[in-house]
């Protein structure tokens, strides 16, 4: 019963947001509440589940909210204007070079393994160029989202350590054969960027730029009075120090962004009224994304608290016919994206994956192959509304999450298919009939 309700809840949720009957925020909150009540849970129990889910995402929500404020202030001060001008002089107004450069930059920055950091750095560097040249921002969001999903499979990314720990396999044994698979995903992303960039070049042409972006151009989107050219070096050092601490992982991301934002605000805008105006300028974005993350916490809290996710996993495994047992690695590779789109990574890797692994072992499949297969679907996972950094990305770029999903999903599926094919070809995962 719980499994059926869980699947129905997912279908209703996706239908509501794809048809735009409800906003993502209201669908995230109301859909699980209704289905939990139908399942027989009381208001008090559902309330406790909601609070539990909110508590789990609270640190992430605070981090992202202050990260948006920090990078918003940095854009206001003009920190990124020289970099935008330099990049413009290199790409010479060619949309193709900019879009391909977006893919390369995303995957380079994503080597730190953190989606929020990757999105903030990539959008800060590239969005002004997209706005200045008229390139569709949805392309930036799509490339960054799918590219981050591919890089989430690196050994220190979000998926690989979970898969290794959930199944008790040696991380080195898991990741070694996956290196060519990850490389194929990266090449696929560059190829996709080339196709999209070529289409934008055909639409816009190569634009002649007579001067670099400045405060009066769309790239800056900020009035001269908020620029702080005399504090440029200070802001650069502060940002580099922040990024260095982020990469080191020695200090909480939430703590780092709260402190960095306060320092940046006080130094650049010591006047209290100016501080209020700058915070107000970015408050709508902060509120929209923060509320979305807390709503996602409500969804996952109820999904986990009602045990729907556990029952869904068991029912799906039981549906695999005995004669298809040897195909389980390929099935896991192709379905892991669907699973992790509909539920958080933790729920999949620690709830669903062990069941899939035990089933595969019964058919003579090595569990390390299941671990490898389970991380291939990450490009699709990173488009999920349950991933907090996804809301950060669409908020920074200025697109809706449903438009982002509609645009990027086909490219994410393509990346998963390519990576699965390469994994089968080189023997990282195997099938038998």
Swiss-Prot record:
Pfam families documented for this protein: CitMHS
Function: Proton motive force-driven secondary transporter that mediates the transport of citrate complexed to Mg(2+). Cotransports at least two protons per Mg(2+)-citrate complex. Can also transport citrate in complex with Ni(2+), Mn(2+), Co(2+), and Zn(2+).
A GO biological process held by the record: citrate metabolic process
Organism the protein comes from: Bacillus subtilis (strain 168)
Predominant subcellular localization, coarse grouping: membrane
Record keywords: Cell membrane, Citrate utilization, Membrane, Symport, Transmembrane, Transmembrane helix, Transport
Origin superkingdom: Bacteria
Residue intervals passing through the bilayer: 2-22, 24-44, 60-80, 98-118, 131-151, 176-196, 247-267, 286-306, 324-344, 345-365, 379-399, 411-431
InterPro entries in alphabetical order: Cit_transptr-like_dom, Citrate_transporter
Name under which the protein is recorded: Mg(2+)/citrate complex secondary transporter
Membrane association type: Multi-pass membrane protein
GO terms assigned for molecular function: citrate transmembrane transporter activity; symporter activity; transmembrane transporter activity
Regulation: The uptake activity increases with increasing Mg(2+) concentrations. Inhibited by FCCP, TCC and nigericin.
Subcellular location per the Swiss-Prot or TrEMBL entry: Cell membrane
Expression induction: Expression is under strict control of the medium composition. Induced by citrate, via the two-component regulatory system CitT/CitS. Repressed by rapidly metabolized carbon sources like glucose, glycerol and inositol, via the carbon catabolite repression system. Is also repressed by succinate and glutamate, albeit to a lesser extent.
Gene Ontology, cellular component aspect: plasma membrane
Name of the gene: citM
Homology family: Belongs to the CitM (TC 2.A.11) transporter family.
